[in-house]
Amino acid sequence: MALKRINRELADLGKDPPSSCSAGPVGDDLFHWQATIMGPADSPYAGGVFFLSIHFPTDYPFKPPKVNFTTRIYHPNINSNGSICLDILRDQWSPALTISKVLLSICSLLTDPNPDDPLVPEIAHVYKTDRSRYELSAREWTRKYAI
């Protein structure tokens, strides 16, 4: 079941890739993918190329994939291990969702962080109280780690 679904998503990604994202298997292991997200132009991550690791569980799509950033990023919802605080990767997962939709959701999280559900409270505090300092740090990290 999982393998059939993963193969279908891979074919769909090839036919209709989401803008500014790409994903595919690492070597021959269809349960382990690498994804790339281009930093959205209207965000402090513009110009950056961010790599993510995707691990599909054997009961996919009934359980969400494990997705994390392998590129460091300064963001209130993404910690230093690359873990992402995103509801659809946890309790709001649905088998109707696809990797394409997950990547688009992560892209929109880069444009619109959610400081009210932070994984890194310190960054969320800076985001809420000093937006220009947040954007400066995010741009610096992007330049340092993602370009």
Swiss-Prot record:
Per the UniProt entry, the effect of residue 81 to A is: Reduces ubiquitin transfer between ubc4 and pub2. No effect on ubiquitin transfer between ptr3 and ubc4
Query: Where does the UniProt annotation place the signal sequence?
Result: none
Listed GO biological process terms: positive regulation of mitotic metaphase/anaphase transition; protein polyubiquitination; SCF-dependent proteasomal ubiquitin-dependent protein catabolic process; SREBP signaling pathway; ubiquitin-dependent protein catabolic process
The EC code for this enzyme is 2.3.2.23
Q: Does the keyword Transferase apply?
A: yes
Name the consequence of residue 90 to D. Reduces ubiquitin transfer between ubc4 and pub2. Enhances ubiquitin transfer between ptr3 and ubc4
Q: Name one GO molecular function term.
A: ATP binding
Q: What class of enzyme is it?
A: transferase
Q: Which residues form the active site?
A: 85 (glycyl thioester intermediate)
What Pfam families has UniProt attached to this entry? UQ_con
Gene Ontology CC entries for this record: cytoplasm; cytosol; nucleus
* Annotated effect of mutating residue 90 to A: Reduces ubiquitin transfer between ubc4 and pub2. Reduces ubiquitin transfer between ptr3 and ubc4
SMART domains linked: UBCc
| UBC core domain ranges (all copies) | 1-147
Q: Which reaction does it catalyse?
A: S-ubiquitinyl-[E1 ubiquitin-activating enzyme]-L-cysteine + [E2 ubiquitin-conjugating enzyme]-L-cysteine = [E1 ubiquitin-activating enzyme]-L-cysteine + S-ubiquitinyl-[E2 ubiquitin-conjugating enzyme]-L-cysteine
Task: Tell me what effect the entry lists for residue 92 to A.
Answer: Reduces ubiquitin transfer between ubc4 and pub2. No effect on ubiquitin transfer between ptr3 and ubc4
Listed PANTHER family: UBIQUITIN-CONJUGATING ENZYME E2
Protein role: E2 ubiquitin-conjugating enzyme that catalyzes the covalent attachment of ubiquitin to other proteins. Mediates the selective degradation of short-lived and abnormal proteins. Mediates ubiquitination of pex5.
- Sequence similarity: Belongs to the ubiquitin-conjugating enzyme family.
Q: Please give the name of this protein.
A: Ubiquitin-conjugating enzyme E2 4
